[in-house]
């Protein structure tokens, strides 16, 4: 099962998160159609920008688009001209106010989508598919990946009959749900037809899945501080100063005061009887 299914969908809610975050009832199909159009717009005209993924959040009158790219300078443009153009196109498409965020991918050598695009660009430039695959695998392993698998399918080398070949280095546990496996796909357009490139990159196991979910929730909430943080003073024991059981220790000294005076009165009574 793990060999066939998309690794992102297989681990959704465990180690990966939704790329589109919104809720709709009657407008569901319209929003899905808009999301497809937005992602198609981002990838069609900016192949050189190295866009890894596009995340979309929606409210009633606002759309937030996060673009993860390896070359943010190309997306921003000179003095932000390209970013303004993209924002204007998105507002025309959605009819709502668009908040555009451009985020840089820190390590593009271990991003599966960017690796697939790099291999596809080399195939379009008539580079040998074996050489392109091995070069990308070496770069990913040097960058810190624990395992990588690259598969190319199509008329490889201009052959009459299409076939698929893959190379693997390290471990790529596709059945392990706690494994952080990144997946990317891209098509190379060559003179012999299209060649599909699939990339799986294993980055290690996720030790605490609850922490990953908490980080994803914090990122969606805009990094808001959680309730009961370090700046909040801690409440006392049970009840505290609100009354009830918390005030019983304060009444104990008043109840013990008569017992302390009792020994002082006893000698006076004994002297009186002796006289």
Curated annotation (Swiss-Prot):
Residues 216-228, 249-268 have a biased composition (Low complexity). Binds the lower part of the 30S subunit head. Binds mRNA in the 70S ribosome, positioning it for translation. It comes from Streptomyces avermitilis (strain ATCC 31267 / DSM 46492 / JCM 5070 / NBRC 14893 / NCIMB 12804 / NRRL 8165 / MA-4680). The keyword RNA-binding applies. Residues 38-106 form the KH type-2 domain. It comes from the Bacteria. Residues 229-244 have a biased composition (Basic and acidic residues). Belongs to the universal ribosomal protein uS3 family. Residues 216-275 are annotated as: Disordered. Part of the 30S ribosomal subunit. Forms a tight complex with proteins S10 and S14. This is Small ribosomal subunit protein uS3. Keywords: Ribonucleoprotein, Ribosomal protein, RNA-binding, rRNA-binding. One of its GO terms (molecular function) is mRNA binding. Pfam families: KH_2, Ribosomal_S3_C. PROSITE patterns: KH_TYPE_2, RIBOSOMAL_S3. InterPro entries: KH_dom (IPR004087), KH_dom-like_a/b (IPR015946), KH_dom_type_2 (IPR004044), KH_sf_prok-type (IPR009019), Ribosomal_S3_C_sf (IPR036419), Ribosomal_uS3_bac-typ (IPR005704), Ribosomal_uS3_C (IPR001351), Ribosomal_uS3_CS (IPR018280). GO terms for cellular component: cytosolic small ribosomal subunit. GO terms for biological process: translation.
């Amino acid at each position: 099962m793990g060999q066939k299914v998309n690794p992102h969908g297989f681990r959704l809610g465990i180690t990966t998160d939704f790329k589109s975050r919104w809720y709709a009832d009657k407008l569901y199909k319209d929003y899905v159609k808009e999301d497809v159009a937005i992602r198609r717009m981002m990838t069609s005209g900016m192949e050189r920008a190295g866009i890894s993924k596009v995340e979309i959040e929606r409210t009633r009158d606002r759309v937030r688009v996060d673009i993860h790219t390896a070359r943010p300078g190309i997306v921003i443009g000179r003095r932000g001209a390209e970013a303004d153009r993209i924002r204007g196109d998105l507002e025309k498409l959605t009819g709502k106010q668009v908040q555009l965020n451009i985020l840089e991918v820190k390590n593009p050598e271990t991003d599966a989508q960017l690796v697939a695009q790099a291999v596809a660009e080399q195939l379009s430039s008539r580079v040998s598919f074996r050489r392109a695959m091995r070069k990308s695998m070496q770069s990913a392993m040097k960058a810190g990946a624990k395992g990588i698998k690259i598969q190319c399918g199509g008329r490889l080398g201009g052959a009459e009959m299409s076939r698929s070949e893959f190379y693997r280095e390290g471990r790529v546990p596709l059945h392990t749900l706690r494994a952080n496996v990144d997946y990317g796909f891209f098509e190379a357009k060559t003179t012999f037809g299209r060649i599909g490139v699939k990339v799986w990159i294993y980055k290690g196991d996720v030790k605490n899945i609850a922490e990953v979910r908490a980080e994803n929730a914090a990122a969606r909430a805009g990094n808001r501080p959680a309730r009961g943080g370090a700046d909040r003073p801690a409440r006392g024991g049970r009840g505290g100063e609100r009354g009830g059981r918390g005030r019983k220790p304060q009444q104990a000294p008043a109840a013990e005061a008569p017992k302390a005076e009792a020994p002082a009165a006893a000698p006076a009574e004994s002297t009186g009887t002796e006289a």
